[in-house]
Amino acid sequence: MKKSFTFIVSVLLISVQLQAQTEPTAGNWKTWLISSGKDYRLLAPSSYKEEIAQVLARQQALDSAGWQQIIYWNAGAPGYRWHEMIDKLWTNDLSNNGALANMLLGTAIYDATVVAWDTKYAYNRPRPYVADKRVKVYAPKIESPSYPCEHSVAAGVASTIIGHFFPKLADSVNHMAERLMSSRIAAGVAFPSDTRAGFELGKAIALKEIERTKDFVTKTEWDKKLPQGPGVWNGKNPMFPTAGLCKTMVLESASQYRPGPPPDFAKEMDELRNFKQTFRSSANAFHYASQNTGADLLHKKIFEYNLHLNPPRAARAYALAAVSIYDCFIACFDAKYAYWGIRPDQYDTTYHPLVPTPPFPGYPSGHATMSGMIEVLYSYLFPTDRAIFQKVAKDGAESRFQAGIHFRTDNEAGLELGRKVAAAVIKKVKNDGADNNSGLTQQNRKH
């Protein structure tokens, strides 16, 4: 046990040498679903001097479980652990609500972080380890004022959003939030009042954004009418048949970039029949069929570019991705159910794909749509890695052909749709106050 404690403390002491780049003007950045950061500025905090004893007491009482919580919540940006959770939840949600839940987690954490940064620099409350040299610091030093706690802001948002859309998890996420807040106090980076204020701020912004988007998901029920005829999808119980009726966030409508009708797939069916599967092609097909590539890649790049040490800019990246995913989902399913494009194993019932065919029309490909979005949006956020994102888009789209569940035209149309959606999102935030034509501050570039 003693060796374990020594190792944990050494890891924490190494980590705190990392200096985060702050964004002192982030409180002025434009927000998504609230008017501005300034309009929601918190009231001034009371004196922190009486709270120093509480921080010291927490540190003196740290046990193994407390150390583990500090390490767990030190990882990534304030929203990192919550985005990891929602990534798994929304992609397995069978309603139209999953994509909205994912989007709101991104926009609400970002908007609440903007409010937090406005409040921080309005009052300039010092961090506990700055206010009193007896306080040790066991977390990366975020060079920004203490009030309110940015991790607690994200926790307030996440517990509210996840609890609302996935009510069975409400108790669990609230307990997680409590442990998070306790860990920030014990780590010496927040006073108890910082965590309480941050949590309540996050909760308030989340509730407001849930209310603002309450009519985004369509209430219209599917009429259960399946089209008939050659070249038309002919499965049973299609998933998300009304998703294209939902409101979009950036696009003027779900059909704004709807591709033209699909061609006759006779030649493309021949291409699939004649395709010679290799170890590499099957590996690519299985990889993209089983991984949430977009989410994993975004987490990775945020770490590589040290944006996890820059809470406002990390929150912005997560929000841009969440909004883009949401509009891509709506636009893609608008097109799917506008055309009811047939799948290869329906066009030729003797054809057997490598992976199971999803239960909805094929044109355009959802994977390809998300791949096109990744290529454009991530290249904006992390421009030096543009070639990586181009390859991911190409491989991701091609994987659906290699898997035998999409015609090539499905993928080409999807890539183009995703690129257009991402471009529209980027255009919207070009003047948000954070953009500097590259999406990154020079200090945060990967070395």
PLM regions and their residue ranges:
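Acidic/polar surface patches and capping/hinge elements
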Residues: 21-447
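Bacterial Sec-dependent N-terminal signal peptides
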Residues: 1-21
